[in-house]
């Protein structure tokens, strides 16, 4: 959740409030206490999922939940849902989305334990429900309408090694520029 909070604060500085909810005790309170001094965005530690989801434009789920907890009512206000964790969302909630975008499909459809891929293997979500891959959107070979409360978009991040490689490349370039680290001959 910490990395998602950092990403939101960086990519969406115009957000007026971010509610943080945790399935496990006071983790959300510690996260809010650590990041509130670093931002003008109001951070709140929501006591319940219902409170966190109420009025939220964007919902990001990043847990290791073994059973889904996000129901259709949690998505009433949301226009974008980012599924980064394991098994957070019910099939009924997935049915609320106009578009579903995945970072990868082929590599994940038969092996991932994430909600979307489970429902696909169970025959509850068909391939026709997948609007695009992230790559196709970035390349401009596919488009989807802008997300809104009436046109909800789900993004499922299975997680590709290419992202790890990309981040490693950036880290190495920065380290070289700052003359940090040790050169290793391969």
Residue spans of the language-model regions?
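Conserved SAM-binding loop of SAM-dependent methyltransferases across substrates and taxa
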Residues: 2-11
